């Protein structure tokens, strides 16, 4: 997707405020890392098509690269999130889907 819709922006805001990368026992929320909109753009089609599930969400997280050290190292967002955060993301998406679709 090249442009964000109000629906994706609303989902991105929820993701950005609630989902964080754990960096040396410090929470870097996805909004602060500027990863909330790209993630929302990847998972929103799953919600639209009623295909939300762990495998699809993990595939979206794995597809999103996080640059570390000025781009010297790249890891997937799936690897950067704790299992707790992945579960929280799934719950957030399920709740969003039940309210909006």
UniProtKB/Swiss-Prot annotation:
Keywords from the named record: Membrane, Thylakoid
Subcellular location: Cellular thylakoid membrane
GO cellular component terms given for this protein: plasma membrane-derived thylakoid membrane
Primary location recorded for the protein, binned into one broad class: membrane
Bilayer topology: Peripheral membrane protein
Pfam family, one: DUF3181
Transmembrane regions: none
Keyword Membrane assigned: yes
InterPro entries associated with the record: DUF3181
Coiled coil spans: none
S-S pairs: none
Protein name: Thylakoid-associated protein slr0729
Species whose genome carries this gene: Synechocystis sp. (strain ATCC 27184 / PCC 6803 / Kazusa)
């Amino acid at each position: 997707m090249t442009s964000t819709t109000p629906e994706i922006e609303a989902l991105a805001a929820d993701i950005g405020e609630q989902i964080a990368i754990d960096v040396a026992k410090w929470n870097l929320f996805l909004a602060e890392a500027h990863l909330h909109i790209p993630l929302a753009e990847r998972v929103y089609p799953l919600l639209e098509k009623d295909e939300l599930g762990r495998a699809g969400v993990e595939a979206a997280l794995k597809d999103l690269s996080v640059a570390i050290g000025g781009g010297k190292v790249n890891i997937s967002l799936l690897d950067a999130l704790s299992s707790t955060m992945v579960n929280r993301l799934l719950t957030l998406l399920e709740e969003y889907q039940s309210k909006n679709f």
